[in-house]
């Protein structure tokens, strides 16, 4: 059996292999809303939650991939600390808790990204 598109398939396989050997990039932290309405703050809270989940997933997956015993310690966000009701006060409390956790893990994620983004085998 002869493969007619061998160069193309070789190039495609090489591209897939090399593209999978890098770690994900880090997105920008969501910016604060212009207005302090319930809707705007709720959306901001959701964006911060997504951002934390991304950072945590990045850290966990990178830790597994690099398998380095000197990998920095980090804690996962405890969602049980979030208020369940949708009042302005509760949402502002949740935003403060989310931003506090981001302030703790973002520097670790940035450090890991800078260290390993080009050095993944």
Curated annotation (Swiss-Prot):
One GO cellular component assignment for this chain's record is: cell outer membrane
Under InterPro entries, the record lists: Borrelia_plasmid_OrfD
- Give the superkingdom in one word: Bacteria
Query: Its membrane topology, per UniProt?
Result: Lipid-anchor
Keyword entries, A-Z: Cell outer membrane, Lipoprotein, Membrane, Palmitate, Plasmid, Signal
Residue positions of N-palmitoyl cysteine lipidation?
Answer: 20
Sites of S-diacylglycerol cysteine lipidation: 20
Q: What span is annotated as the signal peptide, if there is one?
A: 1-19
Pfam families listed in its UniProt record? Borrelia_orfD (PF02999)
Places the protein is found: Cell outer membrane
As a miscellaneous remark, the entry gives: Is a highly immunogenic protein recognized by sera from Lyme disease patients.
This molecule's function is given as: Outer membrane lipoprotein that could act as a component of a potential toxin-antitoxin system in B.burgdorferi which could serve as a plasmid stabilization mechanism in a growing bacterial population.
Q: Tell me the protein's name.
A: Outer membrane lipoprotein BBA14
Q: Which organism is it from?
A: Borreliella burgdorferi (strain ATCC 35210 / DSM 4680 / CIP 102532 / B31) (Borrelia burgdorferi)
Species classification: Bacteria, Pseudomonadati, Spirochaetota, Spirochaetia, Spirochaetales
